[in-house]
Amino acid sequence: CKGKGASCHRTSYDCCTGSCNRGKC
């Protein structure tokens, strides 16, 4: 995964689900 999601501000970008998520894959 390259960087974080554009819409993800306080939450990290989950590369597995392709959405904002607090946890890591």
UniProtKB/Swiss-Prot annotation:
Chain ranges passing through the membrane: none
Job of this protein: Omega-conotoxins act at presynaptic membranes, they bind and block voltage-gated calcium channels (Cav).
The organism of origin for this protein: Conus magus
Protein family: Belongs to the conotoxin O1 superfamily.
InterPro entries listed in its UniProt record: Conotoxin_omega-typ_CS
Disulfide bond residue pairs: C1-C16, C8-C20, C15-C25
MF terms in GO: calcium channel regulator activity; ion channel inhibitor activity; toxin activity
Residues modified as Cysteine amide: C25
PROSITE patterns documented for this protein: OMEGA_CONOTOXIN
Protein name, UniProt field: Omega-conotoxin MVIIB
Coiled coil: none
